[in-house]
């Protein structure tokens, strides 16, 4: 069983990388070359493949047509309602911001990937426009970014603040690049005025915090590639203004959508309203821990039956 969480072969090392200006460098090129060599060997040896979205493993089908007969399942990173119930029964302290101070705390929780900087820049440019056009709303806004480096060790590098400084909005931004533990992340999400969800320039991208964000019962501002599975999920589970969704595409990039992001951001800061009636709770059941575990178990059963049949 291969859990193909992130594509091994993509834009990294080809058009983007760890070099100056986000361009490919020697390390990213070598990483891509190694992935191109190892990937076919690994997927050929796998009896089944799981991924967070069907678009992720469909890339493998495009590269290796013979893989189409291999059992595959899309198993997104879901959320468990019981975790939120337990958290609300036993509140944890919030040492990062005061949810009752009258400010609008818009919180992002999760790693900021290299291909996500274009989206980040568009969001911060929208915040800069808010400062120019609606200084009253800008003064109320607080943008918090948690776990952006995905590192748990002290001294994790800043990823958001340098961009915020360059765009002149650092006075509204705080960043805690170190990764939060699970319950702290849920605490931030449940106590935020609203939750910010940002995607990547890659079509397949899906957010690991999407379902916890929906279960947090807070308004959402989501900025994603139009082909991301996140867009379909949000539009099928939560209506505006509870979930405000701005999309971009391959031609109409995130930078071209700053005005649309500004409109939604301004409306959100002016009235960060959450309406539980706007959420299709029944549709969220299929992304609970129990439902996703059942989906994985069904795939394992399928592999087991095929293996036994092959041994007979």
Can you say where each PLM-predicted feature lies in the sequence?
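Nucleotide-sugar donor-binding and catalytic loop/hinge architecture
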Residues: 85-105, 133-136, 269-272, 302
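Conserved donor-binding/catalytic core segment of Leloir-type glycosyltransferases
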Residues: 95-117, 124, 292
